[in-house]
Amino acid sequence: MNDPQLNNLLKWGIQNSDASRNDPSTAPQPLSEVDKEALQQLIAGVRGPSDADLMQDSFQVIENNEATAEAKHQAFENFEQLIQGIDNANNMEALGLWTKLIKQLESEDPVIRKWAAWCCSTAVQNNVRSQERLLVLKNAIPTLVRLATSDPDKTARKKATSALSSAVRNFQPGLDAVLEHMPAEHKPKEALDANDMASVDILINKLRESI
């Protein structure tokens, strides 16, 4: 072992082992700040990257112009699986990933647009905190409405419709924003109640039937 910090950790571990603690002549030795840092790094290495690290890694691939389309699609699939956990979905804001995600809705690649809409849907489903975040993001709702009503790729339209469905249920401000940007031919004539699933379905089913 050539790393001095790891050598110090090993020495500290031996000194503070059960055998040493049972020896009256051996007093426990505290870790120095440098050794504490080394211990944290060692533990992190054993545990592997955190979900936050993996989420950021996914977007490094997605935003890499040199990455293949296949690699980007796989990165998006990995990201979508991660944000199925509500804590990870809520952590998107702190990691600065919401703005990056919305930007991908404008991708020239229809598969990327599909995945971006899919991830929006996953993040906001039954999650009022993420619903609120999507609402205030510039162009997020208008872009999803445009994709749901006019994207040339049917799969992207379906996922955008799913994202709108998740964004408005039990969240009246989101429903009001979607209706505000909805083209007239897709907008129901009656008033809609976000807390009434049958009411919301009037809008969502109308969108799905148009695909």
UniProtKB/Swiss-Prot annotation:
Comp. bias intervals (Polar residues): 12-29
Query: This protein is called what?
Result: Hsp70 nucleotide exchange factor FES1
Native organism: Phaeosphaeria nodorum (strain SN15 / ATCC MYA-4574 / FGSC 10173)
Sequence ranges of the ARM repeats: 27-67, 86-125, 129-169
Report the gene name.
FES1
Q: Name one GO cellular component term.
A: endoplasmic reticulum
Q: What residue spans carry the region label Disordered?
A: 12-31
The entry's family comment says: Belongs to the FES1 family.
Q: Check the record and name the Pfam families matching this protein.
A: Fes1
